[in-house]
Amino acid sequence: MHGTMAAPAAGSAVSRADVNEARGLVELAGQAATGLVGTVRDMHRAIAGRPFWALSLAGKPFGPVGAASTVPARFLHDHISSAVYKGLRSAGSGVASAGGAAAASLTRQDARLLTRRPAGALAAGVLNGFLGDLLEESGNDLLTQIGFHDGPHQLELERRALGEALPAATPRIAVFVHGLCGTEATWRVNWWGTRDAVDYGQRLRSDLGYTPLYVRYSTGLHVSEAARALSELLERTVAEWPVEVGEIALFGHSMGGLVSRGACYRAAAEGSTWVEKVRHVFCLGTPHLGAPLEKAANVAGWTLSALPETRPFGAIVNRRSAGIKDLRYGYCCAEDWRDCDPDALLECHRRDIPFLETASYYFLGATITRDSQRPLGRLIGDLLVRPSSAWGQGLGGRHYPFEIERLRTYGGMHHMHLLNHPAVYEQLRGWLSGDPRELPAAA
């Protein structure tokens, strides 16, 4: 797909011609300012409440009059401070409204401040990772809509447009689903610095005849919501593909592995056509049993929320997106999180969802230690995901029914190296070509 995708037609459903990222930035800045004022206000009230409470307690021995002696002072304090904070919030909202009106007058090109440039698109990916659910709730134009991308161009899912954009489309499709805070570009970033990154999709095109498609989506939404959107996207893709689709291989990095598994689960339950074509599901560094960093954030948010003085900080920590919170225990479907408190202390509601009977699954992990069996490597894994979670083989937890040949751990790598490392590609190609050999660089 790289270098061959045509720009989407203006006004088409996928081009989102009405998107105004400048307006979205202004609106988000206004929300941030309002939220900051609210946080300061809550801290002020919590801290000020302590001395008022202490003075009231000290006055109790003198009867009702003594206990109520602080009421006038507190009444005056609360009303003055409320008026000040209300004024600050109104000022912030006014500035945001004025900025939004100015942004609305920009041309379509000028309005796309972020995604028209590669670095900006990556920044938008990070923003969506942390605030995707907030962007959706507020209808913000910065919310990334799911689609197949190649740089600034989005693939239009209509048969004629697909034929023009992908004249060499084949019956074999390789779908790449990025992880948290990423975009399709993360598959091509040279994470090794001095080494050449391997574009798995382009190599699979030349080596095995796959047509690569790179997904871009908002990673701040629930994994189950991204999975639903991916399922719908693939259903349209199969229906409009220029040739009859014979095989689909899914490649998910980190959160992308959960999204891929969730999409297959939902599609199978709904009887979607596309899932019948899936033959391979690859999960690279996917936290099937959860990520320790998100567990730590959960503990921090819960602890900070325990006291009035630190509760505003707890609210900030707990403002993490729904997508991030799903990584705590590897949630894939809505039943995992629906009707549950997302900020409850280390409560796991994950369900075991079935694999596709028609597909082979492959789980790959990494450790920063060259020997993946060393205690340090097993403890911290690739810095974000432990090998036990990447394999779905936790102690006392679920154990996926894998043949050992479908599980690999790479030593001397961090989380992002799995995106385009030569040794990883050789293993992927070997599995897809039916080569049973165990290839180098695995422990």
Where do the PLM segments sit?
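A Trp-anchored, charged/polar loop motif used as the substrate-binding/catalytic surface
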Residues: H149-E164, L233-V238, A334-I353
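Helical cap/lid subdomain of alpha/beta-hydrolase-fold lipid enzymes
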Residues: A119-A124, N128, Y265-A443
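Flexible, membrane-associating and regulatory peripheral segments of lipid-active enzymes
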Residues: M1-T194, G201-V215, E225, P422-E426, ...
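Serine-dependent carboxylesterase/thioesterase catalytic core
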Residues: R45, G49, W53-S56, G100, ...
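Short, flexible hinge/linker loops that cap or flank conserved catalytic cores
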Residues: L166-A169, S206, P242, V275, ...
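Generic structural motif
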Residues: G151, L180, G220, T367-T369, ...
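Short coil/turn segments at beta-strand junctions that form active-site/ligand-binding loops
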Residues: T170-R172, Y210, E244-E247, A359
